[in-house]
Amino acid sequence: YKQRLVDGEDIVCDLTGGLGADSYFLSLKVSRLIYVERNASYCDVAAYNMEQLGVRNIQILDDNAVALLIERPEKLSGVNVFYMDPARRGAGNRRVFALEDCEPDLNELWPLLCRSKCKVIAKLSPMLDIRRLLLQLPGIREVHVVSVRNDCKELLLVADLSCVPDDSKNDDVVP
């Protein structure tokens, strides 16, 4: 389903690579994909899997998404779409769903992404208040509610950050 949200000419950066499943399927549709993951062992698994699957358009980066956006943006040259699926497990492997409890915290990441003026696709918990998300994160153009057999599994936010003013801030209090 997520493949429908990207085009063949897109250069996508998956900022939360994990084991690489989403990166793999997105890579089948786009010209190039940059996979970013801070866990080196996950990077190794993803690299091995991509090689076994014959994927040649993925670059694996063992890095932290926030640090990469701030300190090494040149590694993201040409990227026009950012994808992320923030980890929704907290201490003791407990499920979390609030943006600020996920890793990375999308509230922290959003201002950095706004500077890119790119498209952003974020996979989030279906427990989130959509109205609040629209107020919290500027530039959201679409919200996809993904369900399987009438069971809501996830929300997919699609944002066009080229429309967000440079002085836009996320420090407003949201009800």
How would you label these PLM feature ranges?
Residues 9-18:
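Conserved class I S-adenosyl-L-methionine
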Residues 32-38:
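Conserved SAM-binding motif I beta-strand of class I
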Residues 1-10, 38-78:
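S-adenosyl-L-methionine
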